[in-house]
Amino acid sequence: MPDTVGEHPALFVTLTAPSFGVVHTRRAGPDGKPRRCRPRRDARVCEHGVPLSCALVHDEDDSQLGQPICAECFDHRGAVMWNNALSELWRRTTIYLPRAIARRVGMTHRRLRELVRVSYMKVAEYQRRGLVHLHVVIRLDRAMPSYRAAEVKAPPAGFGVEVLEDAVRAAAGEVSVRLPATLGDFTVRWGGEVDVRHIEAHERRRVAGYLAKYATKSTELAGGVLHRVAAHQVDGLPVTEHVRAYLWEAFALAADPALAERRFGGYAHALGYRGHCLTKSRRYSTTFRALREAREEHVHQELLARSTDADRRALAGAIERVASFRFVGLGHLTAADALLAASAAARAREQRCAAREALLLEA
């Protein structure tokens, strides 16, 4: 990527989920100090008789953070469906965004595609409440002809960062996904908190650090699990009741044959989310293939420089490198080899048992 890409109009956008219930939170006041969680002047309670206030100032590692104040009021089913439809919501956002840009500069969508190209990289991050947020770097590039598609140039004049910001906010407010009637005629939208920040050239490295931090988070932040689970394992998992409710709702939705293609059960451990942690548009930056090829060439040159054998150096320096595998066999070649292996394994087991017994006698 050219160094001039840092001068293109670019935004760091955070797209959040809507509220599915009141949860314990940690907020900072104008002075930067943490504030009380959910202070209320009245003694209001929910329909289940649970007080809707919390006067505590939670620590950053407080296990209550992200937990619903009333578990019965929290819409776990809606949250699972929202996570499940998030990838489709983002796909439609990428369709709405160029249209919103075209409206703001007063031209048709077709003409816009001849002038600019929207590039992005997004990272999915789990929040403590179990919902997935997206952190996205969105950049405007000049649209290039097909024979120069790999080139990245600055967009024409008139396509500044202010135009891009207005379009992002408009697209986020307009886009929606209507789910099938089998899910209760549920409509998926972005939450009201859309954070948009301008990225200056000197901030590129800092934003990359943010994205790397978000990419390392997983469902563990919400108290979830990293592996797939079956319905009969849910009750025995070491998770919070909040996460357990997510899992049960996912498996309840998976039981409906009409929803089989949405794979709620297969992604129950991900709280319904089916997308990737990190994705990008084709021309945003280099490709994984290019990185693999560069890494392969680097390792090849390192091995070539370290080798002292003339034949190996000649083979490694060949223009064409061919590697092949041939199936030799499975298991032991003879019955005697199998007997020796079984005897060695039996002796190892006996020695471990004897060592454990010796430790018990010493205790």
Where are these regions (language model features)?
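Extracellular/periplasmic catalytic domains that process cell-envelope and extracellular macromolecules
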Residues: T4-E7, R129-G130
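Short helix/loop capping segments that flank catalytic or ligand/cofactor-binding pockets
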Residues: G21-T25, P145-R148, E220, G224
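A solvent-exposed, charged loop/short amphipathic helix patch at secondary-structure junctions
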Residues: V23-M81, A154
